[in-house]
Amino acid sequence: LGGLHQSRNVTTVVTEVLVDADDASFQSPSKPIGGFMEEAEAREHEHADGWTVIEDSGRGWRRVVPSPRPREILEMEVIRQLVESGTVTIAAGGGGIPVVRDERNHYAGVEAVIDKDLAASLLARRLDADVFLISTAVPKVSLYYGTPEQQDLEEISVADARRYIAEGHFGRGSMLPKIEAMIEFVEATGREGVITDPAHLAAAAAGGAGTRIVA
């Protein structure tokens, strides 16, 4: 902002995100974290450290941890007030801090990683955002990514997105959670979402770049 001669306030909100203590992911870890490993190294961690490991999208082996779905953002009202005041607000970083609520209505942290895309989708819905943008490493969503048959997508419907998921086009540790986050936003609001890379964010916000996901 300084380089653009903008004088707007910027703040970061440490964000607690409520999850369900009975979420199935606590019994079936699914969120890839950390670097890629050879299978032998992954199996060693599995036996020695109790890790759950998977083969991830043909790129190698990774550890997976519980990733419960975000239900509510505890600091939502504060975030809303900051946004409405014109403050550039950074929230739900890394998916936020996962917490559960006990029978006494007290909150406690849990060992898990909330998917950052699903948390961002929840944040966008609670803020009643006009458009939901996700920045990633590629300018557009693709089918058959990384193959000679790669097909970049300009616009897809929610129905298209669900079909492509069923056909296995999107990797669990890469594009899949972004598409799922977009589906949630578009279905809940009727508005569009866009996925693109940082270089095309401004153009995407104006409708001129990226992959648009529509109802």
Label each residue range with its predicted role:
Residues 1-215:
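C-terminal catalytic "cap/lid" subdomain
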